[in-house]
Amino acid sequence: MPYSYYRRLPASSKKIYRASDKIEDVDLKDSYELLPYVRNVQAALKSKEKANVMRASQALTNQITLQLNIPPIKVKVLTSRPHNNYGELHGLYEPVSKKTKVAEISVWMLTAKRKQVVAFKTYMRTLFHEVCHHLDYELYKLDDSFHTEGFFKRESSLYKQLVLNDLV
């Protein structure tokens, strides 16, 4: 069932939305090969050092894009999440544009108000969420990246393969 904003989309966007909604899994070639990279992100978050978190996150996303044979993503890790009366921003995906030759992901590692390092699982879900936007453009060749049920299932697919598999 489409989300409420679907009915306001133009026909061309509805077509993209429906295509996105049908894709539910991310088919990694070897998720177990990526588990050490996930552990490195966890260790980096524990260190509370932004540079460590950025390096580990970049290495993990590099391996994901290599396995999926798609262009790489530049990962930026920022400190405190921006926020306003409407909420706070956890991550941001910026596709390739005339200005940038590589797509970029920004992920915030500290909570907005308390300035605490975000929980590992929360950080990973945010990182995978932004990676899924990249997959929409580069792997699935969609002209836009909508938050569909399929999109969130793809995010969960990455999470299950790379975080839950490591916790078992």
What are these model-derived regions, one by one?
Residues 1-51:
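N-terminal low-structure segments adjacent to metalloprotease catalytic domains
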Residues 68-72, 134, 138, 162:
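Amphipathic alpha-helical interaction segments
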Residues 140-144:
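A short acidic/glycine-rich loop-to-helix N-cap element
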Residues 81-121, 134-137, 147-158:
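Active-site scaffold of zinc-dependent metalloenzymes
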Residues 2-15, 73-81, 99-110, 161:
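Short charge-dense sequence patches
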